[in-house]
Amino acid sequence: SEAAEPDPKTNDDDVKTNEVELDDIGLRFVGLTKDTRSQYNLPKNLKGVVITAVKRDSFASNAGLTVGSVISQISQINVKSADEAKKIFDDAAKKGTESVLLQVYQNDFSRFLILKIK
């Protein structure tokens, strides 16, 4: 059978995404949609969540996270939505984890950084 074209109705980029705020880390982010991609000028094939706010002097700002950066991986888990990212952060916090490894796309480069979460 021929590979079918993905159904345009279920295109990830059209899913309306809720903004998630992680107050204790000082981070706010949303899933990637057509709108957020064009707003932050991000490549089409990039997956993850885009940072919409970073609180001053927070764990997030100390780690070097900036608005418009994309978190594509948390603790080596690929992130596809804001809810999923929140769950990974919540699970890490429940386990008492002090920091997580993030893969972040910033200024056209992908890099890893450590984010303290408590």
Please name every model-derived segment.
Residues 1-118:
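C-terminal recognition in membrane/secretory proteostasis and scaffolding
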